[in-house]
């Protein structure tokens, strides 16, 4: 049985074909008057039929195979302007066809034209080429960034531009080379062929020949087009990357952070007599959508069966009435380093007030007091481990300045003979090795006479498509699904090892997906109404937290920065109130900021400039005063 068309689709079809045929007829009029020498009835009819068919067929082919526009003939899925856009596209394609036909039939010819003012001509050409290159770069880079880094935010982009972003994976760099860099080069070269040409265009239909496009006209048109392209490219980039939010970040001020900030330095914190170890595992891009639908996820088949079993033994703060949920992305927390800043400081990572605000080891949130600072003061040994380079995104600065951690990254492993001299896989070395190195380091820490705080971050589930270990099988069609399935199993295996160790009795394990995945291809068919949230799990917290009522773990609205007071509570730290930074202890009965004020409102306020943040978190006044006194 054939499904009948909706009224909107039926009207859309008529309008679509009407506009396509109209464009073809207009082209045929130009063809007859400008290119057809003998205007007989048969030649005119042939021109109309040819131009309508060729222009529409070429346009449809490009839309389908090059532009890959989905559901071309399902008009209910397109805007009302869709037929008019098609009309303009057919006209453009048809004009190119007519121009080529004019050249082939000798109606249009080219002739060398020597410019009268060579210096001026070259200036026009160079500026035209420069503007064209910049416009191509703006458009292609915006498209690449939006497609490669799903959910890329302006604050992330600006912070990374202001800081050290070394250590990027080769796969990401390859997509950049094959995408915006190559495309920009091709567009610029093609534009230069037009702009730098010294030939004028001549037109001759019968006996008389005259110039229709002089060399000067070419140069002026090239300049005009390049300026138009540049303006359009900038506008496209601003819209595509939501760069208007940067205006908000710098120009609109909000006192929200100051009004809701509980200063860790002024809070009376009491640690238990026997201080508890803390292990914090950041699982790269691990989110609850990987669970099966009946568990709260989006998958037909559960991609995280081992983490599901672990989660039933621990404590998961879910946004759902039942099933596994968590926290959504929040302002200033949507990429790895920002997520870590949120969880360890109870604050978002905001757009820097000036260049290099995140740029050096002694200038990374100098006014913030983090979990590492607090635990260092309490005599904890602290180690952070990841298979990537600590230089990436400022990780080294964060952990060196705030807690003086032992940093075991790819460089440490390389310099200490833990990996071969020329070994570099994915972002550094793969998670299989990371877990083995982590076991050795945890064993060392446990044998010391101090409590320890161990932090690690995985990388094999990073976009694009993740990294699949040589030891892994591939039961799923999508590469990313295989990477997720193997990675969660290895994470669970590592946690089971920790649970088998003597030190586990006095150890709390906190596991977080650092942020939502940025893998574009894997999520392209997701229902936009499905709410994606980050995975979270706390194992073996102190009894006071373990005995929290069931309603603390469901229907929760919370942010990444709520993890700081929650982690402190999980290891038995008593503190005044239930807040540290702007975060709230999730084990307590105090509503989070998201619950009290609403998620959208809080995120909007955090996007705005905070003078308090700029003057107290990005600056450490105690050091400035001390320096002045020394001087």
Predicted features and spans:
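Short extracytoplasmic/periplasmic juxtamembrane "stem" segments immediately C-terminal to an N-terminal membrane anchor
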Residues: 248-264
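Solvent-exposed soluble domains appended to multi-pass membrane proteins
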Residues: 264-631
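Short, structured coil/loop segments at alpha-helix boundaries
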Residues: 42-46, 77-82, 113-121, 165-177, ...
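Transmembrane and membrane-interface helices of multi-pass
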Residues: 5-247
């Amino acid at each position: 049985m054939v499904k009948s068309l909706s009224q909107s689709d039926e009207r859309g079809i008529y309008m679509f074909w009407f506009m396509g045929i109209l464009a073809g007829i207009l082209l045929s009029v130009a063809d007859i008057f400008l290119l057809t020498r003998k205007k007989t009835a048969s030649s005119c009819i042939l021109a109309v039929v040819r131009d309508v068919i060729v222009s529409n067929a070429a346009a449809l082919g490009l839309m389908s195979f090059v532009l890959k526009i989905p559901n071309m003939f399902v008009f209910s899925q397109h805007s009302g302007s869709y037929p008019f856009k098609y009309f303009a596209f057919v006209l453009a394609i048809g004009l190119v066809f007519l121009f080529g036909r004019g050249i082939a039939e000798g109606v249009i010819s080219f002739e060398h034209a020597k410019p009268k003012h060579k210096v001026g001509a070259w200036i026009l050409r160079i500026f035209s080429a420069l503007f064209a290159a910049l416009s191509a770069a703006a458009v292609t880079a915006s498209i690449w960034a939006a497609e490669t880094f799903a959910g890329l935010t302006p604050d992330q982009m600006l912070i990374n531009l202001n800081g050290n972003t070394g250590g990027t994976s080769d796969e990401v760099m390859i997509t950049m080379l094959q995408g915006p860099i190559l495309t920009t080069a091709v567009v610029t070269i093609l534009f230069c062929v037009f702009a730098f040409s010294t030939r004028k265009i001549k037109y001759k239909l019968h006996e008389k020949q005259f110039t229709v496009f002089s060399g000067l006209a070419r140069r002026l048109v090239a300049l005009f087009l390049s300026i138009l392209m540049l303006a359009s490219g900038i506008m496209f980039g601003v819209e595509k990357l939501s760069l208007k939010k940067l205006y908000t970040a710098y120009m609109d001020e909000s006192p929200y952070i100051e009004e809701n900030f509980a200063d860790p330095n002024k809070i009376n914190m009491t640690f238990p007599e026997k201080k508890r170890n803390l292990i914090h595992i950041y699982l790269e891009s691990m989110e609850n959508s990987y669970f099966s639908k009946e568990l709260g996820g989006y998958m037909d088949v559960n991609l995280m069966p081992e983490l599901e079993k672990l989660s039933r033994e621990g404590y998961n703060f879910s946004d759902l009435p039942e099933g596994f949920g968590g926290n959504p992305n929040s302002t200033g927390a949507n990429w790895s380093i920002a997520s870590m800043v949120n969880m360890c400081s109870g604050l978002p990572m905001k757009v820097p007030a000036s260049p290099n605000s995140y740029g050096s080891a002694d200038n990374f949130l100098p006014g913030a007091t983090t979990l590492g600072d607090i635990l260092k003061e309490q005599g904890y040994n602290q180690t952070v481990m990841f298979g990537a380079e600590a230089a990436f995104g400022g990780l080294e600065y964060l952990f060196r300045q705030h807690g003086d951690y032992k940093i075991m990254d790819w460089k440490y492993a390389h310099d200490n003979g833990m990996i071969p001299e020329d070994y570099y896989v994915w972002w550094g070395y793969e998670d299989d090795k990371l877990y083995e190195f982590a076991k050795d380091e945890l064993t060392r820490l446990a044998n010391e006479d101090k409590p320890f705080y161990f932090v690690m971050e995985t990388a094999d589930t990073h976009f694009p498509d993740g990294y699949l270990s040589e030891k892994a099988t591939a039961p799923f069609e999508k590469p990313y699904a295989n990477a997720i399935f193997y990675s969660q199993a290895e994470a669970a295996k590592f946690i089971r090892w920790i649970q088998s160790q003597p030190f586990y009795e006095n150890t709390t394990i906190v596991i977080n997906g650092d942020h939502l995945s940025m893998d574009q291809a894997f999520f392209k068919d997701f229902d936009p109404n499905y709410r994606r949230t980050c995975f979270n799990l706390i194992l073996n917290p102190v009894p006071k937290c373990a005995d929290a009522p069931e309603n603390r773990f469901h229907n929760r609205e919370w942010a990444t920065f709520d993890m700081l007071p929650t982690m402190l509570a999980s290891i038995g730290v008593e503190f005044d109130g239930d807040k540290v930074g702007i975060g709230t202890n999730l084990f307590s009965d105090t509503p989070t900021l998201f619950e009290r004020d609403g998620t959208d409102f809080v995120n909007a306020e955090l996007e705005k400039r905070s003078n308090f943040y700029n003057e107290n978190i990005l600056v450490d006044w105690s050091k400035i005063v001390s320096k002045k006194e020394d001087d």
